[in-house]
């Protein structure tokens, strides 16, 4: 393994005007670790050991940003959010060989959620993820949009309908 460094900063701002709000967040992260790798010798089935390479930590994007439009009306039991997010390029899989790591590309996302709480304790929750249908490659699977409607009865039972 090796000695890792991980540092950064985060800014989080939220502002409401009556029932409407905006929430913004930005995170910068710098991470690095130097590890040993193997390197193929040109024209041979053998490989050289003792080679090192510096890389970021796995799943550590240097830039992550979110901005959300919020609606909150506690008197009438409404809560809603339209959230956009950006995640920068990040290391997905570390290879034992030099210059053979796999990376995830930067991605934008847009999600919508809403909840209505009734005075009798029942609430209905709706969530739609990945409204822009951004394609993410995760271990050879393509993840697309999905939608959930959840009804909570007395906060003990949960009925869920999902479309994928």
Regions found by a protein language model. Give the residues of each.
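Juxtamembrane/interface motifs at transmembrane-helix termini
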Residues: 43-44, 101-102, 144-146
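C-terminal beta-signal and adjacent terminal beta-strands/loops
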Residues: 85-94, 115-164
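Extracellular loop and loop/strand-boundary signature of outer-membrane beta-barrel proteins
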Residues: 8, 50-56, 96-101, 111, ...
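Gram-negative outer-membrane beta-barrel transporters
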Residues: 1-93
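Transmembrane beta-barrel outer-membrane domains
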Residues: 2-6, 58-62, 101-107, 157-163
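A broad helix-preferring feature
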Residues: 78, 111-113
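Flexible, active-site-adjacent loop/turn segments at secondary-structure boundaries
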Residues: 55-56, 105, 129-130
């Amino acid at each position: 393994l090796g000695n890792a460094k991980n540092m950064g900063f985060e800014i989080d701002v939220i502002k409401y005007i009556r029932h409407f709000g905006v929430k913004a967040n930005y995170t910068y992260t710098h991470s690095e670790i130097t590890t040993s790798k193997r390197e193929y010798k040109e024209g041979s089935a053998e490989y050289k050991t003792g080679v090192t390479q510096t890389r970021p930590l796995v799943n550590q994007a240097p830039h992550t940003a979110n901005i959300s439009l919020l609606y909150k009306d506690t008197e009438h039991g409404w809560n809603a959010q339209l959230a956009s997010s950006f995640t920068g390029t990040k290391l997905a899989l570390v290879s034992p060989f030099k210059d053979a790591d796999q990376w995830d590309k930067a991605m934008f996302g847009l999600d919508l959620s809403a909840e209505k709480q009734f005075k009798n304790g029942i609430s209905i929750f709706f969530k739609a993820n990945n409204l822009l249908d951004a394609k993410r490659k995760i271990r050879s699977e393509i993840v697309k949009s999905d939608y959930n409607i959840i009804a909570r009865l007395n906060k003990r039972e949960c009925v869920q309908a999902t479309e994928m």
